[in-house]
Amino acid sequence: MAVASRLAVARVAPDGGAAGRRRRRRGRPVVAVPTAAGRGRGRGGAVAASPPTEEAVQMTEPLTKEDLMAYLVSGCKPKENWRIGTEHEKFGFEVDTLRPIKYDQIRDILNGLAERFDWDKIVEENNVIGLKQGKQSISLEPGGQFELSGAPLETLHQTCAEVNSHLYQVKAVGEEMGIGFLGIGFQPKWALSDIPIMPKGRYEIMRNYMPKVGSLGLDMMFRTCTVQVNLDFSSEQDMIRKFRTGLALQPIATAIFANSPFKEGKPNGYLSLRSHIWTDTDNNRSGMLPFVFDDSFGFERYVDYALDVPMYFVYRNKKYIDCTGMSFRDFMVGKLPQAPGELPTLNDWENHLTTIFPEVRLKRYLEMRGADGGPWRRLCALPAFWVGLLYDEESLQSISDMTSDWTNEEREMLRRKVPVTGLKTPFRDGYVRDLAEEILQLSKNGLERRGYKEVGFLREVDAVISSGVTPAERLLNLYETKWQRSVDPVFQELLY
């Protein structure tokens, strides 16, 4: 690729997790530079960003827009190499008090996992802020939400085994400390002021910026949890079809997995408050991306969009430089006021792409971002739902045909209303539940044709759609009856 030949660089992670082997690009040796922390086993694949990486050597020539496009294009891979990457977040809490756990408790859990289960530590400013093992990583969201970014795996059986192994490890370490983990989409009991702040430079920048661009950004950062799946594409055309399908159906997934009905101890008026929060977090970098449905859409159009999303930061010398509101286009010509003369590397571009939060996000794979966090069976069901739809040609074509005449207004209406009314949201001459039934059947058919006996992972989805009762409505019913209008029992109900 033309990009590689112009970079004399070594990738170095802040944790020292650079690949410790010699590699050649066009005859030029590129040596990864190790640092003190961690043994840096493995990198790559469809996993979420750990702390940002940086290039050890300055750029010799400016990046071009073609380089930025080539980065995305490099994600194209043949079907036999498609993988499934699952990420989920959860709230840690003290079992005795139900209070959110503080950073020092989280640090002890991370250290315990590292010692007992052989994870490598990721350190920032002498604070342990994550773990890595092979192609899996554990990271901390701004309020201490504990995230597993799974390895790219071939089957849903492997995905579910990975989730179960992780939950077992976290439970084993946490229980000894009187700490539990909760699978829900929004913090049900505690106020923003009760949530601890993690010692990560990136989050400090975001925390200061969020109130300037939306009213709910701090809630998004500190009080939400999600589960998402990352999926591959074979070509630009395949990416476009999957991107459009993912955006059109994201509100349907939001309805099926709606699981955030409480806020500060009482019902909040939504089935998925987490989903609603994204509608007023920062509309420059979130939403339903109507341009994806334009005939002209492709990798280049997404690059143009991403270039226009205001920056958050540049990462240099293990420090974050606040560049909030600045333009990546200015950065490309060395005109960032905060870093004059500094030119971006591909790693800066990679980092910038992680600061964009639409309902479906394009990196070198596609991320489905519409579902609330939930109990472990739903952590297996969410990737199953999307794999059945997007990794089977027949199902993908059926869904593409089914959604091809949906208008931007209809997609936006679903995006706005589903967080409130879930499966009962009217759509054309029926309801979202009717759509969900049809889509579920296509997902089941797609999984059947894959031939890995994966359809069983959709049982949770089947139960929700056949009953018409979302997880959130089930919790609200318990709140009004068995729980006697207290949210405290949810910590036991949805304990991992």
Swiss-Prot record:
Signal peptide: none annotated. InterPro entries: GCL_bact_plant, GCS2, Gln_synth/guanido_kin_cat_dom, Glut_cys_lig_pln_type. It is found in: Plastid, Chloroplast. GO terms for biological process: glutathione biosynthetic process. Pfam families: GCS2. It comes from the Eukaryota. GO terms for molecular function: ATP binding; glutamate-cysteine ligase activity. Belongs to the carboxylate-amine ligase family. Glutamate--cysteine ligase type 2 subfamily. This is Glutamate--cysteine ligase B, chloroplastic. It comes from Oryza sativa subsp. japonica (Rice). The lineage of its organism: Eukaryota, Viridiplantae, Streptophyta, Embryophyta, Tracheophyta. The gene is GSH1-2.
